[in-house]
């Protein structure tokens, strides 16, 4: 790391990676970090070298222009959900808890996982599970969800886990569910 460099963390999360970058920067160094999750924003390090932007990193170029930054020395991207999102039962990411089916990266977004599994049509669900979930058995998953939601709404992570468990090998449960 260049001690006086400019770095970007596009997935701030709990701030652990950003803290490591900041440890290696001198007073001239800068770190621009992005996160759309309010919990991450509230977890912000109080460091004048850090600009934490509450936004999706897809707007990276816009914000670099705003901060008048033409070149960066490095970029960190730790994609996926963060441990604090998994450990918070109210976020609805983990099947360790039976909680509301939420799973929003940004809790201010209107559409949650409950809406998706209960309201999206077959083609939309298949597209999501195939392309974002990278599931080989996306058609079976979709069929099972559509069949079960016809009986009653899928409300919780526990409901979803119960519905999908027959489709998952025990060794793959943590990866799949």
Ranges and model annotations:
Residues 1-177:
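S-adenosyl-L-methionine-dependent methyltransferase catalytic core, i.e., the SAM/SAH-binding region
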């Amino acid at each position: 790391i260049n001690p006086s460099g400019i770095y970007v963390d596009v997935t701030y999360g709990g701030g652990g990676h950003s803290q490591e970058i900041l440890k290696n920067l001198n007073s001239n160094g800068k770190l621009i970090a992005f996160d759309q999750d309010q919990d991450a924003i509230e977890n912000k390090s109080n460091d004048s070298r850090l600009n934490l932007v509450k936004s999706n990193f897809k707007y990276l170029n816009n914000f670099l222009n705003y901060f008048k930054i033409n070149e960066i020395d490095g970029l960190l991207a730790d994609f996926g959900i963060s441990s604090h999102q998994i450990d918070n039962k109210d976020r609805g990411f983990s099947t360790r808890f039976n909680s509301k089916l939420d799973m929003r990266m940004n809790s201010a977004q209107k559409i949650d996982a409950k809406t998706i599994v209960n309201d999206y049509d077959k083609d939309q669900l298949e597209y999501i599970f195939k392309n974002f979930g990278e599931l080989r058995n996306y058609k079976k998953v979709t069929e099972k969800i559509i069949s079960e939601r016809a009986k009653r709404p899928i409300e919780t992570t526990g409901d979803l886990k119960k519905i999908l468990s027959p489709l998952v090998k025990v060794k793959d449960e943590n990866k799949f569910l």
